[in-house]
From Swiss-Prot:
Matches recorded under HAMAP family: RecR
Protein name: Recombination protein RecR
Domain Toprim: 76-171
Species per Swiss-Prot/TrEMBL record: Ehrlichia canis (strain Jake)
Family annotation (SUPFAM superfamilies): Recombination protein RecR
């Protein structure tokens, strides 16, 4: 493979531009045995071993994932998050013991993302099937996040369950993946009912 092709592949990753991609490739080339080969092997293993959870859309080595399969978790408490990074932020902080539903993004008129492009179609069915008592909307406080929250509230509110949203700690325009554990913990504990 051409070195420039590898640099361009890294540049397609989030938060990597041409300069940082070039530095990474140079580091890999200088450290083939200790870094490059184990990294390549790890990426290949992940590509073949991971799968999307059939229940919550998490990524794991099994489906249903280890979170959905955990009998110690509160399966009547469902936190709807925008992306996998948000789920991982909650898990890293060890502040939430319910289960999740990963949307895969937010509704966005600007980017043409409608309900059909997100994991929204089975939320009502899941709430009924698993006797969920509370839905926590754990979506960032962006404009698209607010639109998505409103949409979810509309499709869930007739089910007679508690619907809450994360409160203090999330600034306007803020995204959950960028919050520290303390801020995320405060937001989770001070959530409020929206329907």
């Amino acid at each position: 493979m051409d070195i420039n092709k590898l640099i361009n592949m890294f540049a397609k990753l989030p938060n990597f531009g041409p300069s940082s991609s070039r530095r990474i490739v140079l580091h890999l080339l200088r450290n083939k045995e200790e870094v490059m080969l184990p990294l390549a092997s790890g990426i290949q293993d992940l590509a073949f071993q991971t799968k999307e959870c059939s229940v919550c859309f998490n990524i794991d080595v099994k489906s249903p994932c280890s979170i959905c399969s955990d009998t110690k978790r509160d399966h009547q408490l469902l936190c709807i998050v925008e992306e996998l990074g948000d789920l991982w932020a909650f898990e890293k902080g060890k502040i939430y013991q319910g289960v999740y539903h990963v949307l895969g993004g937010t509704l966005s008129a600007i980017y043409g993302i409608g309900p059909d492009q997100l994991n929204l179609d089975n939320i009502v069915e899941r709430i009924k099937k698993f006797d969920i008592k509370e839905v926590i909307i754990g979506i960032g406080n962006t404009m698209d996040g607010q639109v998505t929250t409103h949409y979810i509230t509309q499709i869930v509110k007739g089910l007679g369950i508690k619907i809450t949203r994360l409160a203090c700690g999330i600034p306007m325009g803020g995204e959950i993946d960028y919050l520290d554990e303390g801020t995320l913990s405060a937001a989770l504990s001070s959530r409020y009912v929206i329907s």
